[in-house]
Amino acid sequence: MYKLIALDMDGTLLNSDKVISEENKQAITKAREAGVTVVLASGRPLEGMQDKLDELNINSDKDFVLYYNGSMVKNIGTNEIIHQQIIDGKAAKKIARKAKELGAYVHAFSQEHGLITEENNPYTDIEAKINGLDVTEMNFESLSDDHA
């Protein structure tokens, strides 16, 4: 008997229209009724997962969510952070510098500012749209070294 099922959202649980099929909803309901813990997992921020958590009624103190590609794990019912692995401002600045050298776009999720980028770009726009987030344009060099 399984005790826990972790489901990736994009490309797995969600179809190409970003919808949970009725078949998947029924299977999740059946698993939960059998006492299996169902965990949604995603590279998305929590805000970008909330509507699916609500749709599946994943909201009790026995429910967990894994987001930001696993860097955050949270008990949904109690809001307790179970795991947190984030980069600081010093690392973010180093990554942004390297991205500039390579001519790559960069954006990050800041606990203080939300979705941040130095220059708005199509990739950041897509990230913002998918997750329902506002974008803050800012110079990464202005982040304090201990900024999360």
Regions found by a protein language model. Give the residues of each.
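HAD-like small-molecule phosphatases
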Residues: S71-A148
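A short, structured active-site edge motif that brings together acidic residues
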Residues: D63-V73
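Catalytic-core regions built around general acid/base machinery
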Residues: E22-G35, K94, K98
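Asp-based phosphoryl-transfer active-site loop
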Residues: K3-K18
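Substrate-recognition/cap helix-loop segment adjacent to the acidic, metal-dependent catalytic center
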Residues: P45-V65
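Substrate-recognition element of Asp-dependent hydrolases with the DxDx(T/V) motif
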Residues: I28-Q50, N69, V106-H113
